[in-house]
Amino acid sequence: MSKIETITKPKLSVVLASQNACRSVSECLGEIEKQRNEDAIEIIVVDNSIDGTQEIIARNFPNVKLVRASKDKFIPELWGIGINQSAGDYIAVTTTHFIPAKNWIAEILKKQEAEYAGVGGAIENDAQGGLVSWAVYFCRYSRYMLPFADEDAEDFAADNASYKRDGLDRVKQTMENGFWEVTVHQAMKKEKMSLLLTSDIVVYHHDSFTFRGFMRQRFWHGRQFGSTRASSIPTSKRAMFGLLSPLIPFILSLIHI
């Protein structure tokens, strides 16, 4: 673990999941550290990389709390570890594959002064990104491309999100196996908490995966989400969904016509 500054009570905890981000981690953490100013902010990186990312963080960012995680952890599980170790009144979540805009922390703190329990932001792609980078972006993040109007939301990507701690504490039972944002957001809405999607908080996606790595990640994330969701559904209903699953491509096609 890195040597870190002593912060009695952080106002904001920035929790970053980190997987094989040696090409972007320095720019990501460098930008966040520039924005700390006089605010009491802690930065926690939970990393399970095999490409030297941990060594870069330990060498160049001594004021960052580096938590080393096992190689089999998914990004939402890394977030969960970091959130459990955080102490801020507010918690911002992203990954080391994203470079925050220069006003990222200021806008997060501003939006957290409102009544929203959670706030999601815009995600842009690096203009110099390659074919795979753009494919990943359009598959996963195009919904959050600028411009768009601010709106009350049901869900948003945790790759650019922030929350009030007391809001997360109210749904902490959903985070026993990691911070899977869809599940967390559904629980927050059931508790009558408000969520906001805003264009004022922006991050930029950099090359995050190889094509093979992204396909593997999507498969295992989908499997984990499906397993978690199915565990709360009666066996008879699961069987019915399984029998009807061949209709999914046709239903999706009709929706998008």
Residues covered by each model-derived region:
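Short aromatic/hydrophobic "clamp" motif used to bind/position activated sugar donors
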Residues: 91
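Conserved donor NDP-sugar-binding/catalytic core segment of glycosyltransferases
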Residues: 103-132
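Glycine-rich, basic loop-to-helix element that forms the pyrophosphate-binding segment
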Residues: 69-86, 183
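A conserved acidic beta->alpha catalytic loop
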Residues: 31, 46-55, 98
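Short, acidic, metal-binding catalytic loop of nucleotide-sugar glycosyltransferases
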Residues: 30-40
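Active-site-adjacent helix/loop segment of glycosyltransferases
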Residues: 204-254
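N-proximal low-complexity "stem/linker" segments adjacent to membrane-targeting elements
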Residues: 1-31
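Acidic donor-binding loop at a coil-to-helix junction in glycosyltransferase catalytic cores
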Residues: 177-186
